[in-house]
Amino acid sequence: MDVKSVLSNAFAMPITSPAFPMGPYRFINREFLIITYRTDPDKLRAVVPEPLEIGEPLVHYEFIRMPDSTGFGDYTESGQVIPVSYKGVAGGYTLAMYLDDHPPIAGGRELWGFPKKLANPVLAVHTDTLVGTLDYGPVRIATGTMGYKHRQLDLAQQKKRLETPNFLLKVIPHVDGTPRICELVRYYLQDIDLKGAWTGPAALELAPHALAPVAALPVLEVVEARHLIADLTLGLGEVVFDYLGQPQANAR
């Protein structure tokens, strides 16, 4: 393979059989259980990178079922998204996500900078309850429950919430272990067809784990729960802040 061929095929690894395809990345019947809770403000501040800013000490704990996604297949993920603002615009910062499918782990980390790890999340309806669970190895570290479709939410309002920007801290090391990429990435969910939105009584339990520290942001109070079903496209990202380009980086 000559240099020109290497460059023309340089999208993902292995170069002869990439772990994930090129987009666009469309999701059909993507189902969310989002439980918003109040947490310790000091602990929250310690995990949100500048220049993002936090307001109320809230966390969205998410269980997401994706039965039909372009190139990524059928999988489920779970994790924490923190409401933030960047230059006065409200959005969400993804702290960590845990999922059960390699292509979106590889693609998520390499393309956007999603902080993804391999685990075993489940989202399913049990009789009258929507139940989300997350196991890391043999350990149950998250359980979320919501009464199934107790009350319908306004679709236009919920769609607007899905359209806000999302932020990721993309970190990729150089071959010597020093940072090669350290960037704040912004992306959007696009072409959203919100098919349903509901709320109901909810509860969330998080358990400590050394390698999956979801409980490091403790649940002090559940303030909201949402069950959403939508078709959408996961848009590609843009770099809004380069940490290695800052004066502090040269002083390391």
Curated annotation (Swiss-Prot):
GO MF entries? acetoacetate decarboxylase activity
Alphabetically sorted, this entry's keywords are:
Decarboxylase, Lyase, Schiff base
Q: Please list the reactions this protein catalyses.
A: acetoacetate + H(+) = acetone + CO2
Classify the source by domain of life: Bacteria
SUPFAM superfamilies in the record: Acetoacetate decarboxylase-like
Matching entries from Pfam families are given as: ADC
EC number(s) per entry: 4.1.1.4
- What enzyme class is recorded for this protein? lyase
Q: Where are the catalytic residues?
A: 116
InterPro entries found in the cross-reference section: Acetoacetate_decarboxylase, Acetoacetate_decarboxylase_bac, ADC_dom_sf
NCBIfam families per UniProt: PRK02265.1
* Family the entry assigns: Belongs to the ADC family.
Function of the protein: Catalyzes the conversion of acetoacetate to acetone and carbon dioxide.
HAMAP family linked to this entry:
ADC (MF_00597)
Protein's name in the database: Acetoacetate decarboxylase
